[in-house]
Structure formats: structure tokens, C-alpha cells
Amino acid sequence: MEKIEKVLEILKEQGLDGIYITKEANVKYISGYPDELAYALICPQGNYLITDSRFTELAGQSCPDFEVVNWHNCGRSIPKAVESICVKSGIRRLGFEECFTTYDKYEEIHRLLSEHRIELTGTRNIVEELRYVKSEEEVANTRIACEIADKALEELVPYIKPGVTERELCARLEFSMKMHGAQDIGFETILISGAKTSLLHGKPGDRKVEEGDFVLVDYGAKYNGYISDTTRTFAVGHVSEQQKEIYELVREAQETGVRNMGPGIVASKPDAEIRKVVKKYEEYYYSGMGHGVGLDLHEEPFLGMYGTKIMQPGCVITMEPGIYIPGWGGVRIEDTVLITENGAETLTHFPKDLMIL
């Protein structure tokens, strides 16, 4: 209930009587609802979870502090369910997540509420600001996700060799995470090889790993909704001097980023230190250096040259500098990192020394 009380405080400060929450991760955070196709409405008069008949039993079990509203009983309409709650609760000014509400739903809700002279007001980042600093329970879930991911990658390594396809390696990795207790994969796995490793979000395909390749693995496990995020780059068979040079630069850059992270640090500061390390290849360092991770893969704080957030104990971030040379390939090394009272603790522990397989 502490989360809800904080939301109600923010609503009061903003002159709102309630808020309609549509972003899936925000609904889970505020209610505990573990699935999809549910929406929350929070107001001083009560907490409501709006879903349909397929999910009402699950909602009742997982959200004991919420009244479950089946929109099938409200004219089979989500907007009409929102209208019914607002009228019943005496809401005069309702906030909604303007970045996560479709225009057609906004129009219909606005039309229905206008008939009752209820104002509909766009809001941003009310729940996200609460998610910025993780609770002990959230950190514990993230730790387990990281442990699962580490074990799965360790099991994958013997299979990274010439002749195996990216798709096969990806399948083995994802299966291993689930066998070790992952609720699901954290996000779509990036497992690419050869020149494809310059693609920041390349997709695994039927390409077979070859001697002299880099193999880049960017993956995560999900546990109780919380996501880990790790990247490691492996060499196969042999490496050139340039491959060694770039790998070691990226490793030094990544470790420099973690060393320069801690409470009170602005999100842009480590980027300047990383750029000093990769100066020779700076034109190929064009991705962000990291981001927050939790219920979403990418969430506040966003790290990089233009980052403005101040790190606080309990923030969970990634540190993922990379060098990407089109037509040649790329290297990325990434860890999930917890901001602590005294600095930064790396939660993913797979070795970062260059492994030649």
C-alpha cells in the first residue's frame, strides 16, 4: 500500500482526484498484477483493476488491495468501465498516462467523462518516478534474474564453435534460462556473429559461426517480472590484433563506467570518462552507455552524454559501452549494476576477459 499512498500524494500535489494507469509495467508495479490486458485506476476512494473475464480470477488472487472490475459488465468497454468508476468515486479531475494511452481510447474516455463534467488531464512519469529507486524486494528479484542469466551463459559457452547457427545458440541459451528458473526471457535475445556484430540490435539467424568471428550475446532473464541485462562478446578460433585491441578498449571503457558510477553522480558523467578510453575509435562509439532496467528493459535513468538524472542508492542500471564498425563487426560488454550507498555493485558476474573458443 505504500506505493499507492505515494501515488495519492503526487495526485494531491497535482490537483488530481485519480489516475488511470495503462502502461503494463506500471500496472504491475502498482498492483502486483502479473499478466497483460489490465488497467488500474487509483483514487482516494479505492483502487481498481480493470480487466476482462479471462483474467478476473487471476486479478483477484494477485491484487488483494484492488477491486476487480470486469469491463464485460460495463458495456464490454474499457472506457465505460473508467466512466463508471469515476462517477461512483466522485472524481472531478482524472489523470491519464498520455504516453501510453491510444488516441481512440482517449477520445472515447474524454467523450464519456465530459458528459459528467469530469476533466481528463494528461500526466507523465508519475509511476515511473516511483520505480526509479528499487525496493529491497525488487533488488532481490533482479539478483536472482542475474544469477539465472550467468548460469545459462556458462552452459552455452561450450556450444559456441564453428558450424553452429546463431539461431541454435539462441535457442539453447533461452532454454537454459528457463530450466534455471526464469519466468521468461527478459527480452528478445541478440545473438549475432561475424560482421553482423556491428548491428546494435541484430537478430539471430541461420548464419553459421566461422573461425575468426566475434559472437555477441546480449540477453536477459526475467524473474517475478524483473529483468537482467548482460552482453558478452566471444572470439572463435583465433583473433586479429585489431580484434584484441578493440575488445580490450571496450572492456576498459565498461569497467571505467562502473568505477565512475555511484550515488550523487549525474547520468552523463561516466560517458565523458568512457570517451577518453575509446578516443581512437570514438566515431564508432555511438550508442548510449547504459540505461535503467527493472520491470522494463529500458527505463529511467538513461545514461549517456545527455543524461540528467542523479543516481541514488537502489537504482539498477546497465553499463554497456560498445564499438561498432560497419562491415567489420563490433564489441559490446554489459553488466547489470546496482547503485549502493558507497558506489556501484555489479550484479552479473560472467567473466569479462576475452574468451577465445
Outline where the language-model segments fall.
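Active-site neighborhoods and metal-handling regions in enzymes and metal-associated proteins
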Residues: 1-357
